[in-house]
Each structure stands twice: as C-alpha cells, then as structure tokens.
Amino acid sequence: MNDKNEISIRQATPDDVALVLQFIKGLADYEKLADEVVATQANLAESLFGTNANAEAFFAHLSSGDGEPVAVGCAIFTQHYSTYSGNSSLYLEDVFVLPEWRGQGIGRELLAYGAGLAKSRGYPRMEWSVLDWNEPAIGFYEKLGAERVEGWLTYRLSGDALERINPSS
C-alpha cells in the first residue's frame, strides 16, 4: 500500500448485501468450506437489517484519491452473552481481507474497529474462532495480543442431529 491509500471503515447498508455475501463466499473458499455457504441475499438482508437483525457488517475501504473507495475487507459481528461475566461481548463471526491486500494493516483496522465497538457498548471483550490449520490468521491474532482460550471445544447441533434432539411435530 502506498502513502496515498487510506483505509476507512464503514457499516454496510441494505444496498451492500450482495457485496457482504461475496466476502462471505471469499472467506468460505479460503477456508475450504465453500459447500457450506447456504446464505442468500434475502436471509442475509434480514439478519443484517431486518426487524430482528442480529448481526452487523463493516467494510474496510481503500481510497487512493483517484476514484471511488474500493471494499478490500469485511467483518461481521454479533452480540454474545457470558453468564460467567454477566456481560455481553462482541463476537467476530467473520473477517476477510482480499488476498492481494493482506499484510497492509487492513485486517488490523477491522479488528480495531470491532474493539472500539465493544468498548463503546461496555463489553469487556471480543471473541472469535479460527480454524486450527489457519496458521497465518492465528499468528496475526496473537501478534495483536489475542489469547487462545485453552480447554474449550466448539460443538454444533445441525441438520439431522438438531431434528433428533427436538423432533418437529
């Protein structure tokens, strides 16, 4: 990135739903999980902007002064609650920077923006998960000062397992 480029962060608007989905698919491709993306523009719009919206998306834009800013990164956050702390926290669901723009401070700006959101809302922390093979991301997070939460595993009920535990009537 040269000196003329500036990073700015802005919240997604309803007009950005297709772009948010594009970033989600880019992350899924990188994580070798493209087959798992079933999100649509319609359900994403509802999650981000509907009556019961439960997520927020933000873009990192790069502007060089010679045209419209270009979205080069995206982060999606949700609220999480901890009974142990008795507080909500900010959960980083996704963060993705386009490959050609990595290593230039864009991911750091997105996480710093999230940290600012957490602080402004009175949340004591921001948390997220990372695939265990994603060493570049792990190194990046640890360089920022994030700590691995030892002793915890993530579990998920979905599909048939979700149906078996609570059969539809």
Would you name each region that the model predicts?
Residues 95-102:
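A short, internal acetyl-CoA/4′-phosphopantetheine-binding micro-motif in the GNAT/acyltransferase core
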Residues 46-59, 91:
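A short helix-loop-beta-strand connector motif used in the catalytic cores of GNAT acetyltransferases and
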Residues 108, 112, 120, 132-151, ...:
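Conserved active-site alpha-helix within GNAT-family acetyltransferase domains
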Residues 119-129:
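Conserved GNAT acetyl-CoA-binding A-motif
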Residues 8-20:
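A short beta-loop-alpha structural element at the N-terminal edge
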Residues 21-47:
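Conserved GNAT-fold acetyl-CoA-binding loop/helix
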Residues 77-88, 93:
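Conserved donor-binding loop and adjoining core beta-sheet/short helix segment
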Residues 59, 68-78:
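Conserved beta-strand in the GNAT
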